[in-house]
Amino acid sequence: MNYNETLDYLYSQAPEYQRIGHAAYKEGLDNSLALDEIFGHPHKKFKNIHVGGTNGKGSVSNLLAAILQMSGYRVGLYTSPHLIDFRERIRVNGEMINKEYVIEFVEKYRDKFEPVMASFFELTMEMAFLYFAEKKVDVAIIEVGLGGRLDSTNIIFPDLSIITNIGLDHMNYLGNTLTKIAAEKAGIIKKYTPVIIGEIGNSDVAQVFIDKAKSVEAPIVFSEVYMSDFVADRLRDKIFYKSAN
């Protein structure tokens, strides 16, 4: 296979619900877990930050990756969708995964993952995990694809979870109210794992996150409580702390 043929193969694994609609939507993480078992759980070899929410996931993920890289860490970044090049989805210290690795992943492991009937998203995710492990990243920023609770990325055990905000998105899959959607997004909150919540929207949404965090003993921080202490200067591209003076 050349690179374009490899991409055609990967795209052909797009789940039926993407082509047909909600009627073909299958709940559960069985495929993701089975695929991860085949590869030996590579995401356990580095720290993870899981980023979910309705809007701003990509921006937050990229900002975090840049901050950590500037702090001296080797950083993996997994985001979706891509704009131009498939390889935008998988980066280490800002550099996209090379084409040869994408080809090698499919050719080398195809016989192993095809019996699982893994989707495009599951394969891409596992490719990222394996690549990050082989590149020996210190930490990986993992962006949720859709929802949270049943997203293929939700097999990881992150060191920090982030939920940017809640809006009415993918209502056929996540629910038709903000609280129902919040409950799906809250699915990435893990036991004992700190979670940062961005824009709350309303008290009912906030309560969904509070209840979920309490049920798994996860420390929870609402960023809106702290952001009032800061002011953004967009002209100078700076953020200032408002002191008592």
Question: Where do the model's predicted regions map?
Answer:
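Short functional linear segments
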Residues: M1-G52, V60-N62, A66-S71
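ATP-dependent carboxylate-amine ligase catalytic core
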Residues: H22-L29, A34-K45, M70-I156, N172-L174, ...
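Conserved beta-strand scaffold positions in the cores of enzyme catalytic domains, especially
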Residues: N48-H50, V75-L77, I155, S161, ...
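Glycine- and other small-residue-rich loops at beta-strand/loop junctions that grip anionic moieties
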Residues: G53, F121, I197-E199
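Catalytic cores of secreted/periplasmic lytic hydrolases that degrade extracellular macromolecules
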Residues: K57
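Aromatic/hydrophobic pocket-lining residues that form π-stacking "cages" and hydrophobic walls in ligand
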Residues: L64, A128, F209
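Acidic, Mg2+-coordinating active-site environments of NTP-dependent enzymes
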Residues: K136-E143, L160-N245
